[in-house]
Regions:
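Short beta-rich binding modules
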Residues: 1-182
Length: 182
């Protein structure tokens, strides 16, 4: 009898730049004293039934009177909102508002309009966004590495894949992305 050796007709690679769908956005800033913004964006990759999280996290720089004066998290948050075509943001007091100045009490609820319904089991398909997925190196040697998504997310189309690759190359060259090699 002849040996059976199946041929691989396609490979599935869930690391690197991949199309994805946003299936949930949670505000976890209340869980951490140091985080003025902590948005956990849950992404479902095309062809996968498993989600990965991209986190937009950080604190504000503040003036002595308590007004927000800056912070790199603000730039990351507005870049993500631009990808969504979302006109929300923060005011000088660090409170969430829409473009008309209306207060947003629950930013996660507000952002839910930019997520897609998902049954928790079906593989992702027709992802509207591109994100970089990778296995993050553990912070301490010998600890577990986790599959994550980088917070830099682009629309899926045009030259966005090339732009995202340039951004990811920059983050890697500066040591902001540390991938597990083991």
């Amino acid at each position: 009898m002849a040996l059976f050796k199946p041929e691989t007709t396609s490979t599935s690679n869930f690391n690197g730049i991949c199309p994805c769908t946003i299936v949930d956005i949670q505000d976890k800033s209340a869980d951490f004293d140091w985080a003025d913004i902590y948005l956990q964006v849950t992404l479902l990759q095309d062809g996968s039934k498993y989600t990965r999280n991209a986190n937009i996290v950080g604190g504000f720089e503040k003036e002595p009177n308590g007004n927000v004066s800056g912070g790199s998290v603000i730039k990351r948050m507005y870049a993500f909102f631009a990808t969504l075509n979302c006109d929300a943001g923060i005011n000088i007091k660090g409170e969430w508002e829409d473009a008309q100045g209306n207060k947003i009490d629950d930013i996660a609820d507000f952002l839910s309009q930019y997520t897609e319904e998902w049954d928790g089991e079906s593989p992702g398909k027709d992802g509207k966004y591109l994100a970089y997925f990778y296995k993050a190196a553990p912070k301490k040697p010998g600890k577990q590495a986790y599959n994550v998504a980088h917070y830099k997310i682009y629309p899926n189309g045009g030259n966005c894949k090339e732009q995202l690759q340039k951004d990811i190359d920059w983050f890697k060259s500066r040591g902001y992305i540390k991938e597990d090699t083991g």
